[in-house]
UniProtKB/Swiss-Prot annotation:
It comes from the Bacteria. This is NADPH-dependent aldehyde reductase YqhD. Belongs to the iron-containing alcohol dehydrogenase family. SUPFAM superfamilies: Dehydroquinate synthase-like. NADP(+) binds at G38, S40, N68, G95, S96, D99, T138, N147, G149, K160, Y179, T182. Molecular dynamics simulations of the YqhD homodimer show that the oxidation state of the NADP/NADPH cofactor has a profound effect on enzyme structure and dynamics, which is consistent with differences in enzyme efficacy toward alcohols versus aldehydes. The NADP-bound YqhD fluctuates between open and closed conformations, while it was observed that NADPH-bound YqhD had slower opening/closing dynamics of the cofactor-binding cleft. Is able to produce valuable biorenewable fuels and chemicals from a broad range of starting materials. Binds 1 zinc ion per subunit.
Length: 387
């Protein structure tokens, strides 16, 4: 096991009616900006519950944050925060709203003579402070509710980049599984795929004898395999929704990634597909992951075989046959959730691969993976295999 420094300071308020504890998490004299997306939180009544919980407090609203939060939209919120002297941000929604709010939190305190896109260009390394934020989660997927990362898009340049900073880690997160009952099936399926791939990005790498982290990861994967499809069939099954919600949080709160090698190449290749073609984040992960595993089967051999046996109970055949079966089982799981796994399924013929590689190069994504050996040439082969 590698050395690690783990700090997970987000307070989690989990369960039915957890919103009741919201008010006491926010300073009583705060000027609060509630951020949300396209309006589903209004239709479902979640926003009304939040406003009721904060009745009597100084509250402003900012809606319209996109599924891939856009820098251009978020800068309008930054302007509002600065003008209105907002002192606390409350994100109400899924990972995109949370990620966008993290950017707002950091950008509002960024030096005014520097374009806040610099936050993405430097990966968040130069963030010195941020407005504190909390969240009310309505879509389990990204784990953004209890981590320090965010991904932001810039429409005008076709960029989608990530940043990390402890300054934007949510102070608290309200997780009520009931809020997920009304999610459209596509978002439920995407959330399961996202959480699944977050887990394997930290698990299917190379062995370092980290038994606790491995078994935590396997537990998350088995739970998603068991309850992910049930969440689609039984949308108001509280226990199923609770398990999926908690699995997504655990997949990316730092716990399973502590002391182990991490990959993240699937995410980097996927970000370029979203930025260029507008695919859902989870759709890009489902496209890239099986192709990447097939390409990197030799360097990932030990963990792919462990994954095959412990997650899919595949124990017969040669090493390569078991790896083939594990990749096929993963692809089949995504497909059964309704998330196709080839570029052609989305009407893409691969003609944009040179442009995708150019963007990877522009963003410095030329030595990806846990071994830093996924070069542009390897990325090209992965994209080609995903057609």
């Amino acid at each position: 096991m590698n050395n690690f420094n783990l700090h997970t300071p987000t307070r989690i308020l989990f369960g039915k009616g957890a919103i009741a504890g919201l008010r006491e998490q926010i300073p009583h004299d705060a000027r609060v900006l509630i951020t949300y997306g396209g309006g589903s939180v209004k239709k479902t009544g979640v926003l009304d519950q939040v406003l009721d919980a904060l009745k009597g407090m100084d509250v402003l609203e900012f809606g319209g944050i996109e599924p891939n939060p856009a820098y251009e939209t978020l800068m309008n919120a930054v302007k509002l925060v600065r003008e209105q002297k907002v002192t606390f941000l409350l994100a109400v929604g899924g990972g995109s709203v949370l990620d966008g709010t993290k950017f707002i939190a950091a950008a509002a305190n960024y030096p005014e003579n520097i374009d806040p896109w610099h936050i993405l260009q430097t990966g968040g390394k130069e963030i010195k402070s941020a407005i504190p934020m909390g969240c009310v989660l309505t879509l389990p997927a990204t784990g953004s509710e209890s981590n320090a990362g965010a991904v932001i898009s810039r429409k005008t340049t076709g960029d989608k980049q990530a940043f990390h900073s402890a300054h934007v880690q949510p102070v608290f997160a309200v997780l009520d599984p009931v809020y997920t009952y009304t999610l459209p099936p596509r978002q439920v399926a995407n959330g399961v795929v996202d959480a699944f791939v977050h887990t394997v990005e930290q698990y299917v790498t190379k062995p370092v004898d980290a038994k606790i982290q491995d078994r935590f990861a396997e537990g998350i994967l088995l739970t998603l395999i068991e309850d992910g499809p049930k969440a689609l069939k039984e949308p108001e099954n509280y226990d199923v929704r609770a398990n999926v919600m908690w699995a997504a949080t655990q997949a990316l709160n730092g716990l399973i990634g502590a002391g182990v090698p991490q990959d993240w190449a699937t995410h980097m290749l996927g970000h370029e597909l979203t930025a260029m073609h507008g695919l859902d984040h989870a759709q890009t992960l489902a496209i890239v992951l099986p192709a990447l595993w097939n390409e990197k089967r030799d360097t990932k051999r030990a963990k792919l075989l462990q994954y095959a046996e412990r997650v899919w109970n595949i124990t017969e055949g040669s090493d390569d046959e078991r790896i083939d079966a594990a990749i096929a089982a993963t692809r089949n799981f995504f497909e059964q959730l309704g998330v196709p796994t080839h570029l052609s399924d989305y009407g893409l013929d691969g003609s944009s691969i040179p442009a995708l590689l150019k963007k990877l190069e522009e963003h410095g994504m030329t030595q990806l993976g846990e071994n830093h050996d996924i070069t542009l040439d390897v990325s090209r082969r992965i994209y080609e295999a995903a057609r």
